[in-house]
Amino acid sequence: MKQVLTFITFLIFSTSIHAKDSTIFTPVSDLILAVSNFDHAKMRAVVDDSFLLLEHGEVWTIDDFVNVVKPADYIRTNYFSVINSRVEGDVAFINYWNKANIKNTERSIDIYWLESVVVSKVGDKWLLSQMHSTRLPQDEIPKGVTFIKQQI
């Protein structure tokens, strides 16, 4: 009986951590899905007014980011692997791997990024304040990382 209670307590504790982590990760997931769908309004809706993207050696505002996201003839499927996260009051810090499979009629490629974000709670929702993204070289695949497909 003690083992059953310990197991149930573990499940409840694990679920609450997972729920909290998924809530703070929502703006990240929503932003990447908006990029995949070329949805500029949604991209803007998940960031705060001071948002900056540090993208592979460049500093971008949300306007810069939106301007490079143009409709194209491909399907993008996203995958994530959260390394860790920490919440301090109304600010959260998340480190994660990001994988995109880009597929068109001619080919399919995987692209990998190592990313970190700062999200801030504004009212009752989390918004992206800062994102740092480093793209891995084309043939470099992160070792020992298990990716989870983004739920749409």
Kindly label every feature range from the protein language model.
Residues 85-92, 119-127:
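A short, structured loop/turn motif at beta-sheet edges
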Residues 8-45, 86-87, 147-152:
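Short, low-complexity N-terminal intrinsically disordered segments enriched in polar/charged residues
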Residues 44-81:
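Short solvent-exposed beta->alpha transition segments
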Residues 67-109:
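Surface-exposed, charged secondary-structure patches
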Residues 122, 130-152:
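Low-complexity, intrinsically disordered terminal/linker segments enriched in charged
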Residues 31, 42-43, 51, 65, ...:
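Hydrophobic pocket/interface hotspot
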Residues 47, 57-58, 96-100, 115-117, ...:
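A mature extracytoplasmic/lumenal domain signature
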Residues 1-4:
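Positively charged n-region of N-terminal signal peptides that target proteins for export
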